[in-house]
A protein has these predicted regions:
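Conserved, single-site charged/polar hotspot
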Residues: 2-360
């Protein structure tokens, strides 16, 4: 009797699958031949076709997403901000990791580069999954199509990414918003090189975004400048030739992102205002005079300074031989490691039916 019941259940599930496929397939495969659907674009690399939202949802519902990731919005190098980008997960992480860190294997040991790339890839994956979950945009990231990456760098980065592509960072069971910046710089609040907390930078206390030391900022900011093409220490001069250093400064005028919009300072009893955004968050700069006594502002770091520092990450991997998990645990307080997307293609309606049929 049990065998008959199991057989009947499998037959019913199979019939349901056939009916649903007949109903849904025409909408999913309306394009003829090899012609891409209207609005679709091939962006380079494996399985990187941008397909309309409706068809993407239909295909995912039927077959599951497999080793792909779909972002509502993502910047693609050379193409700008694109909507509903579906990429092979590994390609996606390789492309964004290359954009973020470049060929650091040319400047540090291969072992250090592998750990740094792994840490970056896990942070990227966590960031993408967080913004997918909460329906927000990941347009701060730029994906470099894998066929545009030099072959030596591509193979080295892919070797690192392939080992961690399913890993994400979690806090209390939920994937985290794993933000990072190029260089944390000198934190004048704590008096050490280190990151800013989410509370310091944005006014929001996030348990895993706390201020931590990052001792290799000074040592590696020149390295990161060569890699990414930006200098992480800037000196701005005012129009005063008084020879006096700043006596005081008001840096409380910030935008919603926590960046100082303008700075009012006092030099030799006269008030000046520097208008324009700083290149780093509050607490990541100080005030002094240059060798000629001209007042100047020293900026340390590049970016918001919250979460993982790329300079610090490379430094920990190179100088201490730290592994990617220890690096991530250092910069993201109290996190755990989880997995998202196991590489299985068993998702979607048919995945459920195959399970019901006992074929998995």
């Amino acid at each position: 009797m049990k065998r008959m019941s199991k057989f009947a259940r499998r037959c019913a599930a199979l019939m349901l699958a056939v009916v649903l496929l007949c109903m849904a397939a025409p909408a999913a495969f309306a394009a003829e031949g090899d012609t891409l659907p209207a609005g679709a674009t091939t962006m380079g690399g494996a399985n990187t076709t941008l397909i309309p939202n409706e068809e993407e949802n239909c295909l995912s519902w039927l077959f599951g997403s497999g080793d792909t990731i779909t972002m509502p919005y993502l910047n693609v190098k050379g193409q700008g901000l694109r909507r509903n980008v579906t990429l092979d997960l590994e390609d996606c992480l390789v492309g964004i990791t290359y954009t973020e860190l470049g060929s650091i294997g040319s400047y540090v040991s291969d072992a250090a580069a592998q750990q740094a790339w792994k840490a970056q890839a896990v942070a990227i994956h966590s960031y993408l999954e967080y913004h997918k979950k909460y329906g927000s945009s990941a347009n701060a990231l730029v994906y470099t199509p894998v066929d545009q990456i030099p072959s030596s760098a591509r193979s080295a980065i892919r070797r690192a990414v392939s080992e961690v592509k399913d890993e994400v960072l979690t806090c209390n069971g939920s994937v985290i918003d794993a933000v990072w910046s190029a260089s944390a710089g000198y934190n004048t609040q704590t008096g050490v090189y280190g990151t800013c907390s989410g509370l310091d930078a944005w006014g929001t206390d996030v348990p895993y975004l706390q201020s931590v030391e990052s001792p290799y900022e000074e040592q590696y900011h020149n390295l990161m400048r060569r890699i990414i093409g930006k200098d992480y220490r800037y000196i701005e001069y005012n129009d005063s030739k008084t020879g006096q250093p700043y006596e005081s400064a008001d840096t409380t005028h910030k935008d919603l992102g926590g960046f100082v919009q303008y700075n009012t300072f006092v030099s030799n009893g006269k008030s000046y205002r520097y208008i324009g955004q700083f290149v780093s968050s509050r607490y990541c700069f100080d005030f002094s005079a240059d060798e000629n006594g001209t007042p100047c502002m020293n900026y340390y770091g590049f970016g918001h300074g919250v979460g993982m520092s790329q300079c610090g990450m490379v430094g920990y991997a190179q100088e201490q031989g730290m592994g990617y998990r220890d690096i991530l645990r250092h910069y993201y307080t109290g996190v755990s490691f989880g997995t998202v997307g196991s590489g299985s293609s068993n998702g979607g309606l048919f995945g459920w039916l195959w399970s019901l049929l006992g074929l998995q």
